[in-house]
Each structure stands twice: as C-alpha cells, then as structure tokens.
C-alpha cells in the first residue's frame, strides 16, 4: 500500500539523471500494483527493487504518477460506494434534509486528507531526498511491523462501516501522514489506526482505500510534469508512464480483490512476518555494499 504517499513530495531540483528502461518500467509498475494496497510499503519496495536490479532510484515522481493506475483500480472496484458518497455529499450540501451517512462520509474523507496535503507540500524536499534513504526504509519496515501486531492484539474489531465517525477519520488521516516515509505503508498506517479504534478489518481496509483517493490522485497529477524531466530519479517518456500506469491498474485491481477477501479471515500480523525478514535482508544487502543507501 505506500504506500504511501511519497506522492505529494515530488518536486523538481536541478540534477538530471538517466532515462528509465522499458523492462524497469514494467517491473516497477507490476510491483506498484502488487504492493500499493498491501501493508508492506509500495514506495519502499519500488526503491529497493530499482536500486537492487538497476542501481538507481526511479524517483518519487515516477512512483507518484504510476500510483494513478492503482488509484484508478480503487475507483473502479469501489465505484458504487464512491458514487453514493459523491451524490450524497452534493445532495446534503444543497439540502439539509438529505444529510445522511454518505454526506458525512464525504466530509470525513475531505477533512482526513488535509493533514497529508499540508505535510506533503511543506516537507516535499525532505521526503523526496533524505527520507528515501535505504537504511531508513529497512528500519521502518521492521519497526512498523510491531504496530501491526499490537493493532491486531489490542483492537476489538467490532465496529462496522456505518459506525465510522469524524474522530475515526481524523485519526486515520493523521496516520496516513506516516506514509510519507518509505517503508511505513500508507495502507498499513491507516488500517492499523482503524484497528486500534475498534473497526473491523474489512471496514478499516475499505476506508483506508477510500481515504487515499484524493491524496494519491492529487500527488500523481502534481508530479506529472516532473516525471518527464525529473531532478532526482530517472526520466520516463509519456508512453512509458502510460503503459506503467495501465500495468499498475490491472495488477492493483487484482490485489484489491485478493486483500478484501484475505482480511475477512486473516490477521494483518501475516504481513509483519514478511516485513521483518524483508527489512533485515535489505540491511544485509546495504552492509555488503550490494545496495546504495
């Protein structure tokens, strides 16, 4: 899942780099689709795989633009719910008597998006450069796994979708800010917060996906100009970005369908069991000089 929202952080800086290749484009787009919605950090995996196999960081701008494909998958998968929220929100704006759950949900998503927008814009340089350090990514992969385990153990997992409140939305929105750090995972941060709040796994997961839509779409569009001629990371052509986005969409849709079924009967601790050895492996590769920090 960015995870994460490296997203609002992709602004330019004058240091041109090499062009991204087609194989790298397709592989990273598939990885983006597979990992965006799983709480294992999509931005972290893109950073690691790009460095390991191509010796270069594809960059925050490439990541943010390709994430448009995975967010399109969310729009298609949850099209019915999204349409109900949009129509319900507009209906409530113009008619107080029609202010039902969808109207409140619309405001929840809007309000919960504000923190990550502010932090993403104010901290764009820090996020694009310093926080993309591989040692940080590896450490966070391990440390944040403990949050998953605690959330599963402490969360009551009783509250349903129609019991969501503005308090839940604000807390999950603040948790979404953690995704600005590669390795945290946007979905991991927001879903864990939802579990701590007592939401059912399916509810926390669904709201996490809906909550990501404004921030990820906004960051992708914001990063689009820089992706063609980035200051940091590799440059991609319009065709490469288009193909990459399509790959991310298809794989992302499949990932959503799988995860929604998985969380109905399985603990998120399974993802912690993956993240910990993955983080340790990255640290080992860094120590051996096989990865650049």
From Swiss-Prot:
MF-aspect GO terms: undecaprenyl-diphosphatase activity
EC number: 3.6.1.27
Alphabetical list of InterPro entries matching this protein: UppP
GO biological process, any: regulation of cell shape
Domain of life: Bacteria
Membrane topology (UniProt): Multi-pass membrane protein
Spans traversing the lipid bilayer: 74-94, 107-127, 134-154, 209-229, 243-263, 271-291
Catalysed transformations (reactions): di-trans,octa-cis-undecaprenyl diphosphate + H2O = di-trans,octa-cis-undecaprenyl phosphate + phosphate + H(+)
EC class of the enzyme, as a word: hydrolase
Cellular component aspect of the GO annotation: plasma membrane
Compartments in which it is found: Cell membrane
Pfam families: BacA (PF02673)
Keywords: Antibiotic resistance, Cell membrane, Cell shape, Cell wall biogenesis/degradation, Hydrolase, Membrane, Peptidoglycan synthesis, Transmembrane, Transmembrane helix
The keyword Hydrolase is annotated on this UniProt entry: yes
Function: Catalyzes the dephosphorylation of undecaprenyl diphosphate (UPP). Confers resistance to bacitracin.
Comment field (misc): Bacitracin is thought to be involved in the inhibition of peptidoglycan synthesis by sequestering undecaprenyl diphosphate, thereby reducing the pool of lipid carrier available.
Xref: PANTHER family: UNDECAPRENYL-DIPHOSPHATASE
Family statement: Belongs to the UppP family.
Name listed for the protein in its UniProt record: Undecaprenyl-diphosphatase
Organism: Corynebacterium glutamicum (strain R)
